[in-house]
């Protein structure tokens, strides 16, 4: 946001609110800032520089522009999911301004974002998931720091169902009981700074333990608390994790797209397939509402339906 008009100050106040009071991550703040800068440019072009002057018609027109391409302006139409994300930022801004007494009415309250098509999460079968993890390398006698780290990251990603940001944000002190015969636990910090404790099994504990003993000391040139380190001694990034997952999937010969979130989807789906209660899975995933977790039950029902259609004599 370039100018210092009323809208600029109000947007900055909202972003500060998200950071300080809501505990939004740096990634979320960056996305909201980009979306609101786009909204601010539209308002400025419309001659509006204060949220008190914004009408429902302004917000409606902005939503329409997001969905409409304009070659003269070099503007491409956004996908429904991108429009929904942008409008979430706009609606949040106006809701905040109303609650804070900046505006008397919420101009965006009645402007609903498009419903993106429901995409079911894609889980890997258990054997393929194990193949991807093993493709990261690292044998019992391996001394290569990168391979030991990559194997530990993938083992822990699948064992805990962590989000990518949660995994790369782990510190050494977030681990507990790696030497316990029944497995250990990890403290994950999710959205809004909420903490949860997730148990992890022996394969992950052993892989992380091997990394801590045989690899991390060689990488820890800067000191610091981060669990997973890059070659320069800094905390690994989400992009590094994405690359590790992508390379391991290719090595394992998996054709479908595999991302760190595929590990989370597989974690949840395999638990439910194994008979886990959905409320337990909700807690392990860190979902605030069980409704979010229920999408995984649709995946397992689809699997059951496919097996039934394939095997039942009266299915055809």
Task: Describe the residue ranges of each PLM region.
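Conserved catalytic core of the tyrosine transesterase superfamily
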Residues: 1-316
């Amino acid at each position: 946001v370039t100018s210092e008009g009323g809208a600029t100050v109000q947007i900055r106040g909202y972003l500060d609110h998200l950071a300080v009071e809501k505990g939004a991550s740096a990634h979320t703040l960056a996305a909201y800032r980009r979306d609101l800068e786009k909204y601010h440019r539209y308002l400025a072009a419309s001659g509006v520089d204060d949220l008190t002057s914004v009408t429902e018609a302004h917000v409606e027109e902005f939503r329409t522009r997001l969905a409409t391409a304009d070659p003269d302006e070099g503007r491409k139409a956004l996908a429904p999911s991108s429009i929904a994300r942008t409008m979430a930022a706009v609606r949040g801004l106006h809701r905040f301004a109303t609650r804070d007494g900046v505006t008397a009415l919420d101009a965006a309250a009645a402007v609903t974002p498009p419903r993106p098509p429901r995409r079911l999460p894609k889980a890997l079968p258990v054997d393929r998931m194990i193949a991807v993890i093993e493709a990261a390398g690292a044998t019992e006698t391996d001394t290569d720091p990168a391979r030991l780290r990559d194997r530990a990251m993938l083992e822990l990603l699948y064992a805990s169902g962590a989000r990518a940001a949660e995994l790369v944000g782990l510190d050494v002190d977030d681990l507990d009981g790696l030497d316990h015969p029944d497995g250990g636990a990890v403290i994950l910090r999710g959205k809004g700074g909420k903490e949860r404790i997730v148990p992890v099994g022996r394969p992950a504990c052993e892989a992380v333990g091997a990394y801590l003993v045989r690899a991390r000391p060689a990488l820890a040139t800067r000191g610091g608390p981060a669990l997973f380190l890059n070659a320069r001694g800094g905390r690994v990034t989400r992009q590094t994790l994405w690359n590790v997952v992508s390379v391991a999937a290719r090595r394992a010969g998996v054709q479908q797209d595999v991302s760190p979130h595929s590990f989370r989807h597989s974690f949840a789906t395999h638990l439910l397939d194994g008979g886990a209660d959905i409320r337990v899975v909700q807690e392990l995933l860190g979902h605030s509402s069980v409704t979010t977790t229920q999408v995984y039950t649709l995946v397992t029902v689809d699997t059951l339906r496919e097996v039934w259609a394939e095997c039942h004599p009266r299915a055809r």
